[in-house]
């Protein structure tokens, strides 16, 4: 079986890229031939993947804002360049589109059996306040395109034989929003062998702290974390700067494993997630997660077993203070690790294969 995986942009630190790469690794381990196709992938990252025996075929080495606008508005240039790459390689039996940006590629009636896996965020991009803030003054124009964008996507997904989502929550939402039945979900695969408890590097347990992922100060959770940092020690992975919290910046995967492992608890970085890589990776490292009781967090976290689910910001702060004052049973760390197995590379790749057969 030969499988082609399509992603708009393969880049270090991207959840979409991790999905494509880890799924490819799992499929190869199961004896499948896999090619990754991307509109953009840097030469350095392509070389890194080659050392992992993964081949990426890409049109360009750097994504631009113009490219993003083209993708948002379904530019034929994006699709035509991707198809040139695909047609110049050996045909695949199956193609999996992982990027919402590439959903319209089947307008060209390509051969093979095609699957689309929705990660939710791009289709509902115009409801994402962080995105709209970053792309001001285009906000009003982008919001005006929301309904027409959904209608285009509703038409285009009808070209796919298989419709999947990255969580049960996403499956439910996208089935409703796009008015089509998404048949199943496949969790984004996490390298649970790599993300496991470790106590090395500079992130030693000199103090208990809560860990949170915040790319920058435009993230919706910044205000909440500001309040939390007044009460308990907080470390931030990302570039956000908050008084009272320690910003680690962008760190390597090795240091990320140690940051997770040494944290007393990880805070879910969003009030609503289609899937939380930070949550899955933290659980894999044996560190419980606290998050809002909505979105995919509900299917990832079992309250008082591998973490905690809260309804409000006040409840989040209160529970964190309680955790830091009284701790929790060590069995929660063991339960966290066990619960992460359903996100493993093996679990996700085998489920994908079974859904195709």
Which residues does each predicted region cover?
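Membrane-proximal helix-turn-helix segments that form the acceptor-binding/catalytic region
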Residues: 122-124, 131-163, 171-172
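Conserved catalytic-core segment of nucleotide-activated headgroup transferases in glycan assembly
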Residues: 176, 190-197, 201-244
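Conserved acidic donor-binding segment of nucleotide-sugar-dependent glycosyltransferases
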Residues: 215, 250, 303-314, 322-328
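Short alpha-helical segment that forms part of, or immediately flanks, the ligand-binding pocket
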Residues: 257, 279-284, 298-299
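Short alpha-helical donor nucleotide-sugar binding micro-motif in glycosyltransferases
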Residues: 258-263
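Aromatic "clamp/platform" in nucleotide-sugar-dependent glycosyltransferases that forms part
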Residues: 271
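Short hydrophobic beta-strand element within catalytic cores of glycosyltransferases
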Residues: 288-291, 301
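A charged, aromatic-enriched C-terminal amphipathic alpha-helix characteristic of glycosyltransferases
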Residues: 330-356
């Amino acid at each position: 079986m030969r499988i082609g995986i399509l992603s708009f942009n393969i880049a270090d630190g991207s959840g979409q890229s991790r999905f494509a790469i880890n799924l490819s690794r799992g499929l190869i381990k199961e004896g499948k031939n896999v090619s990754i196709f991307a509109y953009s992938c840097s030469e350095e990252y392509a070389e890194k993947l080659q050392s992992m025996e993964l081949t990426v075929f890409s049109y360009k080495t750097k994504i631009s804002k113009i490219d993003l606008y083209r993708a948002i508005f379904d530019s034929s240039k994006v699709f035509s360049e991707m198809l040139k790459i695909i047609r110049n390689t050996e045909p695949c039996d199956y193609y999996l589109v992982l990027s919402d940006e590439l959903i319209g590629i089947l307008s060209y009636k390509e051969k093979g059996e095609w699957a689309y896996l929705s990660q939710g965020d791009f289709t509902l991009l115009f409801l994402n306040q962080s995105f709209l803030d970053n792309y001001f003054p285009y906000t009003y124009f982008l919001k005006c395109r929301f309904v027409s964008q959904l209608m285009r996507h509703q038409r285009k997904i009808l070209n796919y034989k298989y419709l999947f989502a990255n969580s049960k929550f996403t499956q439910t939402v996208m089935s409703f929003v796009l008015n089509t039945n998404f048949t199943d979900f496949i969790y984004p695969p996490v390298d649970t062998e790599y993300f496991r408890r470790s106590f090395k590097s500079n992130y030693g347990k000199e103090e208990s702290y809560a860990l949170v992922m915040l790319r920058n100060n435009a993230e919706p959770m910044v205000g909440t974390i500001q309040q939390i940092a007044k009460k308990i020690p907080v470390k931030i992975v990302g570039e956000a700067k908050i008084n009272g919290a320690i910003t680690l910046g962008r760190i390597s995967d090795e240091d990320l494993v140690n940051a997770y492992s040494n944290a007393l608890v990880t805070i879910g970085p969003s009030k609503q997630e289609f899937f939380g890589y930070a949550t899955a990776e933290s659980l894999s490292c044996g560190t419980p997660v606290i998050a809002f009781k909505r979105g995919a967090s509900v299917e990832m976290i079992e309250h008082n077993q591998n973490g905690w689910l809260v309804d409000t910001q006040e409840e989040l702060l209160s529970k964190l203070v309680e955790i830091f004052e009284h701790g929790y049973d060590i069995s929660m760390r063991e339960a966290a690790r066990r619960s992460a197995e359903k996100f493993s590379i093996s679990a996700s790749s085998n489920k994908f294969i079974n859904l195709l057969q």
